[in-house]
Amino acid sequence: MASISSPDGSYTLTAPAQALPLTRHLSYRLTPLIYRLPLTPNQVTALSMLAGLAGAWCFALGTANWGIAGGALLVVCYTLDNCDGEIARLKDMSSEWGAQFDDLVDWMIDSAFFAGLGYGTWDSTGEILWFWCGIAAAAGATIDYVIDLIHHAKSKNQPEAKTREEEATDVRKPEDFKDWLIYIFHKLSRADFCVIVLGLALFDVTWVLLPLGAIGAQAYWITDLFQRARGWHT
């Protein structure tokens, strides 16, 4: 694949050097196609949002076939979520508002997915506990989003604070065992979560994500309270 660079040569789309996240391998092949279209990064983010919300709606229907469709739509959503940043850098259209919009969409999709999955599982089994597990996971995602907003608001006026663009392009590498645990947790629960969802949907067992999400979402926002957990490019 021929390399693509930004007009000033400051950014070049390169092949992923690591196995994870898997969606990065998909976006690496999709971004050159989107680059040729008259789409802005924010429009790509909006497409990602539509795909993700449609996926959440599919899970709310509570059937196996709709679950597979929902999982596929989530893969599209997460892939486009990678593409928007790559398009922003290639077209030199990165902006603080675009980063904030991207964060907002991430929260919307996470919350909608768990709420939809919880409702769909409740509807198909008659057990309302599944619904409350979904709500707990969505609440955890909401708390994490609020923590991120507070973090960025506090660091905004600090001279040494990084911009959203610098945070996105400054790839942090794990240095010790604790770093690797946090790194893998963030990768699997964030960047490649859609692949896990699709895999489980193929066997009609996405319900297992509800208790895991109800607990894991709380663990995610708790780790985000600490500086050590921040900076992973997922």
Residue spans of the language-model regions?
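Membrane-embedded alpha-helical segments that form the functional core of polytopic membrane enzymes
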Residues: 41-97, 114, 133
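A feature for the membrane-embedded catalytic helix bundles of lipid/isoprenoid biosynthetic enzymes
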Residues: 2-31, 100-234
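Active-site flanking loop/helix segments enriched in acidic
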Residues: 13-14, 34, 38-42
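Generic hydrophobic alpha-helical membrane-segment signal
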Residues: 36, 69-72, 90, 94, ...
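Short amphipathic alpha-helical coupling elements at transmembrane boundaries
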Residues: 28, 32-36, 85, 89-92, ...
